[in-house]
Amino acid sequence: MSKRRKIFLLMAFVSATFFLENQENKPRIVSLSTTHSEILLELGAHNYLTAVDKHVSKGRFKNIKRVDSYIVNTEEILSLKPTHVIIAFKNEELEQIFLGSDIDLIFLPPAKNLNEVYDQILTLSKLVNKERVAQNIVEKMKKKKFEIISSVKPNRKRIYNELGYSYGIYSLNKNSLLGSFYTELGFVNIVDNVNTQEEYPKIEESLIIEKNPEIILVGHKEGVGSRVENRPSWSNISAVKNKKIIYLEENLANNWGISSVDLLDDIAVQTGLIQNVENEKRDSLHWLFYIVVIISSVLIMNNRTRKIKEHS
């Protein structure tokens, strides 16, 4: 056997060994959180995902197994042989089962503000070696947030965000992600001083009627009879009378991942604080174009006038 062939075979062996070791060390992630599943997919880490919760869109990555994150089947989870399991809400059963095992249970609760969103994106990126991708995403999110907040016109309108109605009225305060958005956008959230120990307090209908919100945002689905505008006792509320009821896109409103800044933009646009950031950019470019055209026209006219005077 020639020396060159021996070297080639040795290199092939080393490469194969490295590949197998890398495959063995690669995390096998089961994500029981829609938000974090979607973050990992946006980071380009689909090869690390063994399973995701069933609420993740099936339009992409159909080959990734879907599991129930509400009624967790622990036997099914264990059969997938994960190295890491991600949850967004406490699960004592999983904690007990994984205690002392080689499975890392990663608890990433609902973010209370955009800084926590950024931190969770960066935390997950380290797990799947996508730090640079995550850093770029976070920088873009921060830039877009700055553009939105700096475009907002000052206001102190009373606002109410409804999370649930049929089984009790639930809202949110400043200790939640959406609540932090309302604070930054300059709104007065009528629930901010109600049961501040919880981010998503249960409230009485009488409080909403008394506080008389000027804008109502709804982040859940209701039957026609339960819709805000069809509730008899709410007919004198300012937001109802003036048709200032906004139904947020449910998936966008209930997650706190990379799309969080899009939600902030959507709220700012739908409440009339600003135009869509992308539209504002286009409008600015149009105005810049018009100004350049006008200046160019004036310069051309002045030049022609000067030449006419020189020849006369």
Task: Show which residues each predicted segment covers.
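Structured C-terminal subdomain patch of bacterial secreted/periplasmic proteins
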Residues: P27-R28, E93, N113-N129, V133-Q135, ...
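Hydrophobic secretory-pathway targeting helix
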Residues: S2-E24
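Short helices/loops that flank or line small-molecule/ion binding pockets
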Residues: T74-K81, S101, K202-N212
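Short, charged juxtamembrane terminal tails flanking transmembrane helices
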Residues: R306-S312
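Basic- and aromatic-lined ligand-binding clefts that recognize polyanionic substrates
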Residues: N25-L43, V133-L185
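Alpha-helical transmembrane segments
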Residues: V293-R306
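A short, structured surface patch at a secondary-structure boundary
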Residues: R28-K90, F187-I190
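His/Asp/Glu-enriched short active-site or ligand-binding loop at hydrolase and phosphoryl-transfer sites
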Residues: V52-D53, S176-E199, V218, K244-Y247
